[in-house]
Amino acid sequence: GTGSDTSTQRRHLDLGCGTRPRNPYAAPLLYGIDIRSGLQAPGVQAIVAANLALQAIPFADAQFDSVSAYDFIEHIPRVALDVASGSSRLPFIELMNEIWRVLKPDGRLYAVTPLFDHEKMWRDPTHVNPITPKTWRYFCRPELGARMYGFKGEFEMLRQTRCRFKRDYEPARPALGGWLARGADRLTGQAAHLVWEWRALKPPH
């Protein structure tokens, strides 16, 4: 019956989700990817195991209305060397290609990442990919600077802001109190994270 038809329902994918996939756009169908296998979470369609520093996102093209990455992108290396073959890869570029690939036309990328100039970026020894307020220029129009490195997608930056991670800067319009709190965080140096909200530019099917 129509009650079980999920073909037209919005689908969201959370990268590096652990056992608590995030769903910033409140999509009816929630999926996750984590490096660990066998994970489950209530209300989640599936948590698929994949190492996204090495592997493609294990979903078909244009499957998701939105993708999120909370404290994840900083773990993806910019360059990976294969000494045996004398070659190198660009895992960060590859990941951005994959995110764009699995998003539907006009799909949203929502990412929260430690800023390059804050101590929280460098505290964790697995943080290898510092993000700056100008990194977006490599993946978003008009510049698309990462084209020279093999980036095949195209995004439009809808929003970029600093935030304090424990104050979730979700896409929903915040109350005045939230705006004031975030302003105070910036003034006191506690806004350690950068929020991206991008739109995938691609032709309709």
Tell where the protein language model's regions lie, with residue ranges.
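A short acidic, Gly/Pro-enriched loop at the edge of an enzyme's catalytic core
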Residues: 54-68
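C-terminal lobe and adjacent flexible extensions of AdoMet/dcAdoMet transferase-like proteins
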Residues: 149, 153-205
